[in-house]
UniProtKB/Swiss-Prot annotation:
Function: Forms part of the ribosomal stalk which helps the ribosome interact with GTP-bound translation factors.
Gene Ontology BP terms: translation
NCBIfam families noted in UniProt: L11_bact (TIGR01632)
SMART domains: RL11 (SM00649)
Gene name per UniProt: rplK
Description of how the protein assembles with itself and partners: Part of the ribosomal stalk of the 50S ribosomal subunit. Interacts with L10 and the large rRNA to form the base of the stalk. L10 forms an elongated spine to which L12 dimers bind in a sequential fashion forming a multimeric L10(L12)X complex.
Pfam annotation, one family: Ribosomal_L11
Record's protein name: Large ribosomal subunit protein uL11
This protein's record includes keyword rRNA-binding: yes
Record carries keyword Ribosomal protein: yes
Gene3D superfamilies per record: Ribosomal protein L11, C-terminal domain (1.10.10.250), Ribosomal protein L11/L12, N-terminal domain (3.30.1550.10)
Length: 141
């Protein structure tokens, strides 16, 4: 019989920089998980994605063991990096704070495709384009 899952914890952590300090320590500690083991494994898996925030979904089992799945970085982070801006517009309707090309949009869509509820790159591009528009980033040809 498979192990019983006691909790599912979702965190967004800097790639390669997980440490026992909050938010990791308290979230895992209350379920009795070995925090250092998680930190070492997470850092090893994400060291090639340095500079990005990588969401992680941790499944904690009743024997205090765990498994985790890393997701792709949030679309907003990928868009701000591609546009070369620090953050999106507070008021997206008033004006553009940056631009990204269709090629950059397609690259972001291909990166995010496994985590999006889409089956094709074209539909993923529409989802990412909507996110960019809401951030005040315009798409250029």
């Amino acid at each position: 019989m498979a192990k019983k899952i006691v909790a599912v914890i979702k965190l967004a952590l800097q790639a390669g920089k997980a440490n026992p300090a909050p938010p990791v320590g308290p979230a895992l500690g209350q379920h009795g998980v070995n925090i250092m083991a998680f930190c070492k494994e997470y850092n090893a898996r994400t060291q090639d994605k340095a500079g990005f925030v990588i969401p992680v979904e941790i499944s904690v089992f009743e024997d205090r063991s765990f498994t985790f799945i890393t997701k792709t970085p949030p679309a907003s982070v990928l868009i701000t990096k591609a546009a070369g801006i620090e953050k999106g517009s507070g008021e997206s309707a008033k004006g553009s704070v940056g631009n990204i090309s269709k090629a950059q949009l397609e690259e972001i869509a291909k990166t995010k495709l496994p985590d999006l509820n889409c089956s094709s790159v074209e539909s993923a591009m529409k989802v990412i384009e909507g996110t960019a528009r809401n951030m005040g980033v315009s798409i250029t040809d």
